[in-house]
Amino acid sequence: MTALTVPKKDTTALKQPSKQAEAILQAKDINIYYGENHAVKQLSLDINKNEILALIGPSGCGKSTFLRSINRMNDLIPSARVTGTLAYEGLNLLSDDVNVVALRKEIGMVFQKANPFPKSIYENLVHGLRFHNVKKKEWADIVEDSLKRAALWDEVKDRLHESALSLSGGQQQRLCIARTLALKPEVILLDEPASALDPIATAKVEELMVELKKNYTVVVVTHNMQQASRVSDRTAFFYNGELIEVNKTDVLFRNPEKKQTEDYISGRFG
C-alpha cells in the first residue's frame, strides 16, 4: 500500500483488532463540515470486503457527503473540512501524506450522471491507463476485460472507436463503471448510479453491481429503497447528518431497531 502515500513521508499504521479483519474500510468519529454547516456528525462505520453496502436516507442527510469523503473528493470543495480517521488496510486515508491520485485509483467513484469523455469508447477506457503509465501493450486486454466486467463488451466490441456519446444513457453509465474497473480498484463508490436511467437500464446496472461484489467492495448511495433491498448485503440509514442504524438489509427493512428508520422506510417522512 506504499503507493498511497507520498514518498519520503512517514505514515503511522492504524493497527486493527483481528476480529475486524473482514473490514476493508473503517470510519471512526468522522465529522464533515462545509464552512459552518456540520454535514456529517461523529460517524463510525465498518465497510466489509466484498459486500455491497447501501447508504439510504432523505436528501441532505449526509450519505453522499460521506461517500465522497472515502476517496477524498471533498478535497475539491474549498469550504469542506473532514476530521476523524478512515482506515484502509492500515492507512488513515485522511492523512496529509496520502497520495490522493493513487487513492482514487484504488477507490474509484461513479457519479449519478454518466460522464463519459467526448472521445471514443476505447479512449475513455485508456485515458486513465495513459495517465497512470500503464504499458500500451496491455491496453487492449484491459479494455476488453473491463468492458466484459461491466457487461458492455458484447454491445460495443465492434464500435470501440465510435464516440462514447453515441451510447444510450444506460450504456454510458456502464462505460463509466468499466472506466473505473480499468484501473483495477479494490473499492467502487456509486453515487445514485441508476437514478437517471429507465427501468431496463436500471436492472442491468443492478445486475452488474451484484456481479461486481465477487471481486470488489461496493458502496452505493441510493434514494430507491427497493433497489437497496434488491442488491445490498447491508444498509446504513442516515438522517440529519447522523448514522442512525446499520444492519443486514433484510433485517433493517423487516425489523428496524430505531423509530426514525421505521418512519423513513414506511414513508412517514422522506
From Swiss-Prot:
UniProt GO MF annotations: ATP binding; ATP hydrolysis activity; ATPase-coupled phosphate ion transmembrane transporter activity
Membrane topology term: Peripheral membrane protein
Binding site for ATP: 57-64
Alphabetized CDD domains for the sequence: ABC_PstB_phosphate_transporter
Gene Ontology process terms (BP): phosphate ion transmembrane transport
Record carries keyword Manganese: no
Family in the record: Belongs to the ABC transporter superfamily. Phosphate importer (TC 3.A.1.7) family.
Protein name: Phosphate import ATP-binding protein PstB 2
